[in-house]
């Protein structure tokens, strides 16, 4: 795989659980309990401190993007989770010119307070799963779920304990109970190091990421990234601008082909100009039962000595680049272009056998209301034509999927997607949205893709509304229709979700 990306440092953690996900979750919960105890003891008499990780949240991202693409704040939104310190740093430097921008700033602070509340109850129910691939922060692993979360954070720690009970599982997990979303984290020298089940997202897309999305259940593992993304102070590196990295090492759950396989990855982003953000990402599927797990095997994969086609090659890798170009700094238009390219192979030290994503987005004011929109296209075929190659591997035969759901693009490999969405957010924080999607999925009926197990052409429309129904109690509703020939989902469906934050 692309050795040119080997500057993305991968830690060689070896995570192994004797009984799969359940023991992994128990270990994670024990560690989190210890962290909570330490956090509570340290917080006695201390003032509240805005610190910690902020996991994938669609409402928060849209509001931050609305401000960022209008030049009110400067913040990278292509690597999730974000750090609360970086969000706070950006908000403190905000330069609002209109009342609508002040409304959005207030709404972001309100959303952060809800997400990081001391206790948070969430519920979700639906008639079936939506018939089209779902985008950033929209995946629900079950038709019905109830979650309870406890948050505690300070200057150097962040603990998020979460327990969920589910019914009508879409992504089979072997149990109705799980700790998806739970983690404990500590900060040192401006670096956050966390352990738990944290969803990730790498790239500028809204409908998906070609290399690291959130269409599957989060894996259990470690994650490390910067707290604040300040530019280098060294004079000869200042041109890099604000930058961020993220390194993760996780273990796959219920991966039958090679049990206990690891996912090790790294991402680096930088902003040399206010109008341009660049990113590079790399992932390696490595190790597992019956596979080499020595340092030399890891090093061979890290340095790109793979793709031999033999049974003892180090692992399965993907790597690629992405960009976002904003028109606001030069033309004053709140419109941006973005793209992503991810390859399964290497040629000339660069990704080859590529998949592609591209889009355009806009963020406008309408009185004190806000309008967001985007149009996006994906092609997860190899070089926009070849099939049975993307997200597959001759050793890791279950492919780049966990429990049958892709770690990359939500539709899996060999698909094509065209989608657009318009969202109106009123001054009183009601969100109205309309999404149109057209997708061709799984043309070769690959059995490893359980998200869309049959070849199909999907044409769908999705309507959404959310609002505060009582103080900070928030209701989210959705209604959709999908025209499909071979879908396991109902053509017409609806869902409702509720969020109830409590602060002590």
From Swiss-Prot:
InterPro entries linked: Caps_assemb_Wzi, Wzi_sf
Domain of life the protein comes from: Bacteria
Record-linked Gene3D superfamilies: Capsule assembly protein Wzi (2.40.160.130)
Any Pfam family matching the protein: Caps_assemb_Wzi
Protein name listed in UniProt: Uncharacterized 55.8 kDa protein in cps region
Species the sequence originates in: Klebsiella pneumoniae
Upper lineage: Bacteria, Pseudomonadati, Pseudomonadota, Gammaproteobacteria, Enterobacterales
